Amino acid sequence: MKCRRCKATAVVALPSHNSAFCADCFLEFFSRQVQKGIESHRLMTPEDRVLVALSGGKDSLALMLVLGQLGYNVTGLHIDLAIPDSSPAARGVVERFCTMHGFPLIIRDMDAGGLPIPRVKERLNRPICSACGKIKRYFF
């Protein structure tokens, strides 16, 4: 399979766009798609300050990076949910990413705020994902 733009070997196939791209051309395509979406829906202007919620996963980090590259004034927000098996790793990824790319970062620590997810889960008597969702939805 060949890249739609440069004819190099494609590494990403997008059947919904009837396209395939090499890594470099995909990054350009993705960036253009984000910019088009922002403009067509009038989501923000380059003068706006944008707070991007960062989980530490590829989707939120990719969005933060492309918005920064497009010239938007972005700040990251990470909610440390105090889940012993996953929160320290996610927080570390977000901190390293923001440091590496020079993005400002705000961290809200739910343990320090008296709302660690394991304790909230016990009180709600619900699965941990339910407790996490409630905190993210209603606390912020």
Residue ranges and their predicted role:
Residues 2-140:
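ATP-dependent adenylation/nucleotidyltransferase module used to activate substrates
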